[in-house]
Each structure stands twice: as C-alpha cells, then as structure tokens.
Amino acid sequence: MAPVTEVSPMINTLEVADDKMTNLSSSGKPPRNISAMRHCNSTAWLTDYEGDERFGAKSPEGVNSTFQPVFRSGSWSDKGPKQSMEDEFICVDDLTEYIGSSTGAFYGVFDGHGGVDAASFTKKNIMKLVMEDKHFPTSTKKATRSAFVKTDHALADASSLDRSSGTTALTALILDKTMLIANAGDSRAVLGKRGRAIELSKDHKPNCTSERLRIEKLGGVIYDGYLNGQLSVARALGDWHIKGTKGSLCPLSCEPELEEIVLTEEDEYLIMGCDGLWDVMSSQCAVTMVRRELMQHNDPERCSQALVKEALQRNSCDNLTVVVVCFSPEAPPRIEIPKSHKRRSISAEGLDLLKGVLNEL
C-alpha cells in the first residue's frame, strides 16, 4: 500500500502554502475543443467491454447487504513535459481520528494552474473545512458545498497567495458505504464496477452545453475553448484575477457538482485523475488497465503508476496525477462470460450466396 498524504489534526486557522513558485506558468491550458481519445489504442491493454459508456451509478438491488468496504489507496504523479508541477492530491484511508469509530476515507485531486499556490492551499484545508462544517456529518452534501466555497473565499483573502493562481478540485468522501464525489473543473472520477467504467463526475469545460449556457447567462464569453479567452475550465477555485470581488456574479464558478452512491460488492475501485490522463485515455480503458493490474499484483500504487506511464507514452502534454482507491483487500475476481448454448444455422439459399462471394475473392 502506498503511503498516504499526511494530514495534521484539524485546527481553527487555515494553512497557507509555505513555498511560492517563482516561475508561474500561464493560467490557461491548451484548448479543449479537440475531442479526447475515447478508445483504448494500446495493444497491451485490450478492453473487456467495448465502448466508453456511462453505465449509471445506481447500485443494483438485491446486493449483499453485509458488504463492508475496506479502503486502501495508491497514487502517482509526474510533471510530464511541463517545466513545473502544479498538481496536488490527498489520500486518507482512515478517518477514525476525525469521525470516531465510523468507517470513512477522504481523497482529492487538485489540478493547479497559474502556479501551485491554489492547489497546495486547497489540499491542506478542504478536508478539515468539510468536517468542521456545521452540517457534517448529517448532511455531507451541504458540508462539502460549503467547504468548496469557503476554500475559494479563503484564497481571495490570503494576501500571501498569488491571486492569479487557481485549481480544479475533485474530492471523494466516503462514510461507511456512502461515497460522495464533488467536482469543480475537468478532473474526473471513474468507478470500476466489475470491469465496467462508470463516470461519477462531469468534465466542466467551457464548450460543454450546460456550462456554456451558464457562462453566457452570466455575461461570459468563450474563445476557442477558453472561458473569457483565459481558462480552459468552466469551474475552479481561486483565479481571483478573473472573479474580481467576493459576492460578484462571475462565469467562473467554484460550486461543485455532486454525485452520491452506495458502494456494493460489485464496486471494486475508484480512479481519480487530472485532465492530463483523460485527455489521452478513455474512462473504460483506464478501468480495464487498473483491473488487469490489480489481478496481477493487487497494488493500487502500481496501478496509478501504470496509468501515468501509459498517458506519457500517449504524449500527454500536461502534469499527471492519478489516485486509485480499492474497496476490498482482495484482488478483483476473473470475470467469467458464459458461452452461448444456442446453435446457429444457415439456410441453403444463404449458403449458396456465401459460396458465391467466396468464389469471387
């Protein structure tokens, strides 16, 4: 098991990033109007299930009610071809210190831009802001929404941080069997459900229809996939040089979209990754890779490393960060596909037609 990111006990004051990046990159990213690869092209990783569908996140009825998830995670990062690393992540497999005897875990991926300040600050503070919220744990949705907004506003108030720094935020909060995914930006969470890919978050890109409508309603414009010609994401924390003042209406939103599911024994693992992964790999391809890796060595850290390595081989042009969370101590079982017992036949007319075609070859 990979070592988890150390998280200090909750305190009343927010932690500010200690080190500031000296050479800040541009706050924008390459245009996102080019479709991401939706197939698994590597010959080393052929998918068990063709296509890259959204299978729906509802848990099937009649599952084993005695299932109790056991959390173990692994992560891997690489700055890729960029000069600096602006991604951050957090992995906490055991929340006993924070929530008592209940089973719980917390994970996050934060894809920074315009320097590492916003991503580093969010990593250090967002989990404790969730758990310090008055609605936690009775309403994790309200607590999580509040934590995203509070983190965003704290970035505006922190004088030691670069106001032009911003970050996407993707978090997974698990209490007992209930998992809440919160996303603001274009990082993505994908559930591996017996080999099937289930996307639990939506990529918030300016060209997405719903995001475009929201942006234009608030007076924003989109140029070549960029919000106001500056950012390739429609939602982010920070970026106060774009948002202006707190309380003002701005097309760049910090509000997360939420997806909540109840884990079952069919839910094997969760993949969380920044857009550097998903720009070059489909969700289904990633799920298939992780499942086959787990069946070989059952190590989520090595799975994360394999995904990052594959993305680099596919010429990803961004920082890469991947977190893989397993829900069982055991490796996924082999999927047995029953053979069909139906007999196939062909008519005499069809046989003659087939012979004619073959004779012409």
Curated annotation (Swiss-Prot):
GO MF: metal ion binding; protein serine/threonine phosphatase activity
PROSITE patterns given in the database record: PPM_1, PPM_2
Reactions performed catalytically: O-phospho-L-seryl-[protein] + H2O = L-seryl-[protein] + phosphate; O-phospho-L-threonyl-[protein] + H2O = L-threonyl-[protein] + phosphate
Enzyme Commission code(s) on record: 3.1.3.16
Cofactor(s) annotated in UniProt: Mg(2+); Mn(2+)
Gene3D superfamilies cross-referenced by the UniProt entry: PPM-type phosphatase domain
Keyword annotations: Hydrolase, Magnesium, Manganese, Metal-binding, Protein phosphatase
Residues bound to Mn(2+) 2: D111, D275, D318
Disulfide partners: none
InterPro entries to which the protein is assigned, alphabetical: PP2C, PP2C_BS, PPM-type-like_dom_sf, PPM-type_phosphatase-like_dom
Family the UniProt entry places it in: Belongs to the PP2C family.
PANTHER family xref list: PROTEIN PHOSPHATASE 2C (PTHR13832), PROTEIN PHOSPHATASE 2C 47-RELATED (PTHR13832:SF839)
This protein's name: Probable protein phosphatase 2C 47
Originating organism: Arabidopsis thaliana
Lineage of the organism: Eukaryota, Viridiplantae, Streptophyta, Embryophyta, Tracheophyta
